């Protein structure tokens, strides 16, 4: 009996060891490209490429892009986005936009994220009483474009692109923010908006499953930002009732509670998918708490002590007006965007995006954490990353 127990115990340890080895091998990958889906938080020029010359988005005009590119690049920020910092971290060129790119080089990545995009189809939102632009490129439409472009992306020799997809870092989102923005900007009741959350989560989950079936092995799926810290919402829902604001950050607590609700539902679904696909890395990016950390301790990260106002905007307590936005004639921007969290009232500055990317890639804001043990030594020995890491962890 004792011998049998020993045999079973030995088998258990061997099995555990093998599982650990397999897990460590699948957890750490040297990514060859980035494939991205999402909205304006990740758009590197798609909305600009899709727009007519007579109806260009604000990201087509200065001062967008001034900090890094020194000209508008189609990004909704003063400089680089989270996806750009991810690419730099992985030693991959900035990911080009798919839409509007003529003879684009997509060997190292392709980006389908479009400003204003929703997770849900417009027809679903319209059924729920929410207005949606018919030009919206939903997550489903982006995924459809990706699948239709596979022969072009990989060539006729590999029409399904399975090898490329398997070795790609796949970024899905943040997505879903606009599904909530549209009704919230119309001042819909928060309980009505909550009804959209299960639909949004299911849509994101379905996209992940489709990509897994196509060979995808590593996903970063970010949650929503704290909506209550958005300058647009702070302006729209401004109230003299101080109890509606967090005393430390000045953010609207009820809107942040909604963001937490979405993020909890998303994490629960990602946990289910991990159990369903144990061979796949599905990592949750905690954008919510990373951004909140910047709001709570701005000076620690080189930001100004009052981080809520927009760098680029006009009017009101938060330097933001819905009718006259950043990029419009006569709207000025701050002298030092690196001291600001908010760029234009809705999107963040390059400085904020850099901290968020570091918090997710090398800090405590990825669930489960990334394993970068097999990365190139130049990346692992990057001193600036270690500095950022220590700050985000302290």
Curated annotation (Swiss-Prot):
Query: PANTHER family this protein is in?
Result: OS05G0506800 PROTEIN, ZINC FINGER FYVE DOMAIN CONTAINING PROTEIN
Q: Which residues form the signal peptide?
A: 1-24
Presence of keyword Hydrolase: yes
Q: Does the keyword Secreted apply?
A: yes
| Principal cellular location given in the protein's record | secreted
Give the record's family classification: Belongs to the 'GDSL' lipolytic enzyme family.
UniProt-recorded name of the protein: GDSL esterase/lipase At2g27360
Kindly list every residue the record annotates as glycosylated: 136, 319, 371, 382
Mind listing the GO molecular function terms for this protein?
hydrolase activity, acting on ester bonds
Q: Which GO terms describe its cellular component?
A: extracellular region
């Amino acid at each position: 009996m004792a011998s049998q127990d020993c045999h079973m115990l030995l088998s258990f340890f061997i099995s555990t060891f093998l599982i650990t080895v397999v897990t460590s091998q699948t957890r750490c990958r040297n990514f060859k490209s980035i494939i991205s889906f999402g909205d304006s938080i990740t758009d590197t020029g798609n909305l600009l490429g899709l727009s007519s010359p007579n109806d260009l988005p604000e990201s087509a005009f200065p001062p967008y892009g001034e900090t890094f590119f020194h000209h508008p690049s189609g990004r909704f920020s003063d400089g680089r986005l989270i996806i750009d910092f991810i690419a730099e971290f992985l030693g991959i060129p900035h990911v080009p936009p798919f839409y509007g790119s003529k003879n684009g080089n997509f060997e190292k990545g392709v980006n389908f994220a479009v400003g204003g995009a929703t997770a849900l189809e417009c027809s679903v939102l319209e059924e729920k009483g929410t207005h949606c632009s018919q030009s919206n490129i939903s997550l489903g439409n982006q995924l459809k474009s990706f699948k239709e472009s596979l022969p072009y992306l990989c060539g006729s020799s590999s029409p399904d692109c399975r090898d490329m997809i398997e070795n790609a870092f796949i970024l899905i989102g943040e997505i879903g923010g606009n599904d909530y923005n549209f009704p919230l900007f119309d001042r819909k009741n928060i309980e009505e908006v909550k009804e959209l959350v299960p639909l949004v989560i299911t849509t994101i989950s379905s996209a992940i499953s489709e990509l897994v079936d196509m060979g995808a092995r590593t996903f970063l799926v970010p949650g929503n930002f704290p909506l209550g810290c958005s300058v647009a919402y702070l302006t729209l829902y401004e109230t003299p009732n101080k109890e509606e604001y967090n005393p430390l950050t000045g953010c609207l607590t009820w809107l942040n509670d909604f963001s937490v609700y979405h993020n909890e539902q998303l994490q629960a679904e990602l946990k289910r998918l991990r159990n369903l696909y144990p061979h796949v890395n599905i990592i949750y990016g905690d954008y919510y708490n990373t951004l909140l950390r910047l709001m709570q301790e701005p000076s620690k990260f080189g930001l100004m002590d009052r981080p809520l106002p927009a760098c680029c905007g006009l009017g009101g307590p938060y330097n933001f007006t819905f009718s006259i936005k950043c990029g419009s004639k006569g709207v000025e921007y701050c002298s030092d965007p690196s001291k600001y969290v908010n760029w234009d009232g809705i999107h963040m500055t390059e400085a904020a995006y850099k901290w968020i990317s570091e918090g997710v890639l090398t800090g405590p804001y990825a669930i489960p954490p990334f394993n970068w043990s097999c990365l190139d030594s130049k990346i692992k020995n990057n001193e600036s990353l270690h500095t950022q890491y220590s700050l985000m962890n302290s």
